[in-house]
């Protein structure tokens, strides 16, 4: 072996040794700017890239625990889990897909709901888990949503739902399509009772979910750059054979066209929801608004 070969072999072995010393999952990459990020730092930022502000997908349970006051959350309908009633099989058996998704996520299905408080205000909150079969809506997701809405009616408190879904679950056929009617019907009941429902649309919200409860909020909020629509842009382009406008179906485009009410960054979501809900519920704000504090301080300085 020549002296050059020895140098290169030494460098390679030392690099491999260094890589072996780094535990798996310590680093990750932003899906937008592709910056390498420290995993714990990204988690502290609620899965929002600290470099470019891109909102990555966040685990449903993690989202709800970050929203609700500490130690106030009580999970609802935790015992419900899907069954393969139709004995459906595509490339894989549906029951095998369920088992794989449950093993991967540690959850029973694609929706988690909780009862808790937000700045001391009682609320019911639910969130879709896109990692569980694309957040698709089947019988259990529909049942959990309905039971969460019924809980909000019983407690006379607001209901907030974060959507992240590819739509209805095809493996459940008509049973999944029925959930569109069920979820819409319970929201009509909430409206009759005067119970507020806030829908938060996250990336992506598509198909039967966007065509039912996700767009039926008293206030519809979206996260930045979330993909929202019925069919995806690629399907639409192939159907109409035209190039879609830049940013088509993104939350900024929908806000401009009046399809949603506001866009809220994830870091501001707790404060914004509490402020909106206090107004919808006709209750005092649970905190002093920052603008009011600034105005009061300005008035004092002017008087002096």
From Swiss-Prot:
Enzyme class, UniProt record, top EC level: transferase
Localisation: Cytoplasm
GO biological processes: fatty acid biosynthetic process; malonyl-CoA biosynthetic process
Nucleus is among the record's keywords: no
Swiss-Prot/TrEMBL cofactor(s): Zn(2+)
Annotated zinc fingers (C4-type), start-end: 30-52
EC number: 2.1.3.15
UniProt-annotated binding residues for Zn(2+): 30, 33, 49, 52
Gene3D superfamilies: 2-enoyl-CoA Hydratase, Chain A, domain 1
Signal sequence interval, chain numbering: none
GO CC term, one of those recorded: acetate CoA-transferase complex
Segments forming domain CoA carboxyltransferase N-terminal: 26-295
Region (Disordered): 281-304
Molecular functions (GO terms): acetyl-CoA carboxylase activity; ATP binding; carboxyl- or carbamoyltransferase activity; zinc ion binding
Keyword Calcium: no
Pathway assigned in UniProt: Lipid metabolism; malonyl-CoA biosynthesis; malonyl-CoA from acetyl-CoA: step 1/1
Co-factor binding comment: Binds 1 zinc ion per subunit.
Catalytic activity: N(6)-carboxybiotinyl-L-lysyl-[protein] + acetyl-CoA = N(6)-biotinyl-L-lysyl-[protein] + malonyl-CoA
Key words, A-Z: ATP-binding, Cytoplasm, Fatty acid biosynthesis, Fatty acid metabolism, Lipid biosynthesis, Lipid metabolism, Metal-binding, Nucleotide-binding, Transferase, Zinc, Zinc-finger
Membership in a protein family: Belongs to the AccD/PCCB family.
Subunit comment: Acetyl-CoA carboxylase is a heterohexamer composed of biotin carboxyl carrier protein (AccB), biotin carboxylase (AccC) and two subunits each of ACCase subunit alpha (AccA) and ACCase subunit beta (AccD).
Function: Component of the acetyl coenzyme A carboxylase (ACC) complex. Biotin carboxylase (BC) catalyzes the carboxylation of biotin on its carrier protein (BCCP) and then the CO(2) group is transferred by the transcarboxylase to acetyl-CoA to form malonyl-CoA.
The protein, known as: Acetyl-coenzyme A carboxylase carboxyl transferase subunit beta
